[in-house]
Amino acid sequence: MDRDRKRVKMEKEDDEEEKMEKLYTVLKNAREMRKYVNSSMEKKRQEEEERARVRRFPSFQPEDFIFMNKAEANNIEKAANESSSASNEYDGSKEKQEGSETNVCLDLNLSL
């Protein structure tokens, strides 16, 4: 009888150990899932911050500064023609160069 009791007692202990091992594996899996979810949420938050940061600082292209007004386009063309003719017919006089620079009209008004 003692042997049967010991055997039953050993089986109960083995069952309890198996249950404890299962519990620990479930807890370990739950921790890993929580860690994965937290890290993915952190990555999403960082990506959103990066997108917001990019939106705050606009990047300018040379096309942003091209004027579409006909009068300004004519002034730019005249200045380009005068500078090319001045470089072709360079005689060293500063008056001619200063005259070509004063004909250029630039709009420096900033708007938001």
UniProtKB/Swiss-Prot annotation:
Q: Does the keyword Nucleus apply?
A: yes
CC terms in the record's Gene Ontology section? nucleus
On induction, the UniProt comment says: By salicylic acid (SA) and BTH.
Tell where it localizes. Nucleus
Which biological processes are named by the entry's GO terms?
regulation of systemic acquired resistance
- Residues annotated as coiled-coil are 1-35, 69-96
Keyword line: Coiled coil, Nucleus
Q: Where is the region Disordered?
A: 1-20, 77-112
> What's the domain of life for this entry?
Eukaryota
Please name the Pfam families in this protein's record.
NPR1_interact
Predominant location of this chain? Answer: nucleus
Family of the protein in this entry: Belongs to the NPR1-interactor family.
Assembly mode? Interacts with NPR1 C-terminal region.
User: What is the protein name given in its UniProt record?
Assistant: Protein NIM1-INTERACTING 3
The organism that produces this protein has a lineage beginning with: Eukaryota, Viridiplantae, Streptophyta, Embryophyta, Tracheophyta
Gene name for this UniProt entry: NIMIN-3
